[in-house]
């Protein structure tokens, strides 16, 4: 691409993206946001096409494209649909990741969880997921990692409660962030997602009104034993709240859900069969593997239902009202056990449709 440094990339692209409302320009430039932003103006798609294919190119690309500033490890590109909607197209490493995103959308729809709606498509003879831009032209996406780095850490709190506290200090209503956190904790366990890190659960802020809300659930591709040999329900190391632990922690992290009464777990009836159908669409997942995944999901559903029943009215959880003296607001947050306080004290935050559509 002929880019020698990050500074050169910034100068050529103006730092424009589809994830925030910020950009740079020379002081003498007469460029205006209204004429250059990617939310309302057309952009070059050649760079994105090349990034999403397996073919190399010596072409000198225009950086008037959001692809130059899009993060993440998987190949992806932006395009503009006929109605003007910005669409993110994302591939995977194994071919299963795009299907997993669709399955996660189905699951969230069943449970009434706000989530990005993914669809399945085909690009360059490979399965891809597609989803619409989640922001308006006055909003920015702020990652949990950025938010946690912006506040002083309170080591009296567990990792989960430090996140809740930081989100509240950033301006998000306490109940909203607690509910959103519960949502992805539940979905991640049911899907066996192994890659929920501090850069893929976020808040959305309106830069004009400064109102803050949780981002809808997204990025659940690393799920359903994708790329793994063994398919079983052994406990495993879970991100993000126990990422530094050496022992399996997924079941422990599931127990951080604060309010099970929000979920109608009866809506999970038949979900494993739907998953099997979705996985069979591309022909990339063997039938024996699909059967094994469906069997494990049935067991996970039973486990989640059992935990929800035993949680009852959450009477075993000690809570504390954190008021102005703590700088946290007045939300009710679970108070960590003494053991958890010790264990988390040295934590260092880490960044760490029914048929295909062709593009």
Regions found by a protein language model. Name each.
Residues 1-186, 190-192, 203-350, 355-359:
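Phosphate/dinucleotide-binding and metal-coordinating scaffold of catalytic cores
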